[in-house]
Amino acid sequence: MRLNRVGITGGAIYLALGLLWVWLASPPGPAWLLVAWFAAVALVEAFIPGEANQVSFARAHLAAPAFVYSVSPGHLGLLAVVLAVAGLSDLVDGTIARRFHRPSTLGGGLDPVVDGVLLGGVAIGLALGGIFPLWLAVVIVARYLLPAIGGLVLIYLHRRPELRHTLSGQISTALIIILVGGICLFRFMNQDATNVVVGAEVVIPITTLATFVHLGWVARRPVTTPEPG
């Protein structure tokens, strides 16, 4: 892969916004770690083509403030806002890809990676703060980690994994964002979040299992020639 103008531009914009957030918000924790995260993501982004993929990278950058707010109980309202923005970016990147007829295998592989980084970090942070059940955080991490491991196994077996969006995966991610964001919002407003937590404990494992079954079924089928990009 080589440097890409769209990727460099997108990474520079996100890096500037990240540095501005660190300066204005003075978030808890070492500032240099946050700056290093934004810089590292921007560096990777510089090699990734496509406008839709740049929108997807917003979620990788948002992982830093999301994790910081998830381990700070007084910032759960801001975490809910970050998750709402992340969910919006998930809608926008797909819309851009379809609008300009540029869906790609790269985008199909990138989305679950950035979603896993964002939502896995949030789930772990909330579990560490006692806001979220630890076992459910493990389920969310596994939701994104196990398919990635499965893809690596297929590559090791000299099979090309089919990188594309699946309906079950999109529904699973959307519900995780909605339910986790809802828990944060209820706790921030000092409202009883028991029903939302119970809903998450039922819905997230079911949709995760459905995603695994769907991905396993897709992996059994012959791989068609992927689109470039």
Task: Describe every region a protein language model picked out.
Residues 32-37, 42, 54, 60-106, ...:
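Membrane-embedded alpha-helical segments that form the functional core of polytopic membrane enzymes
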Residues 1-53, 113-229:
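A feature for the membrane-embedded catalytic helix bundles of lipid/isoprenoid biosynthetic enzymes
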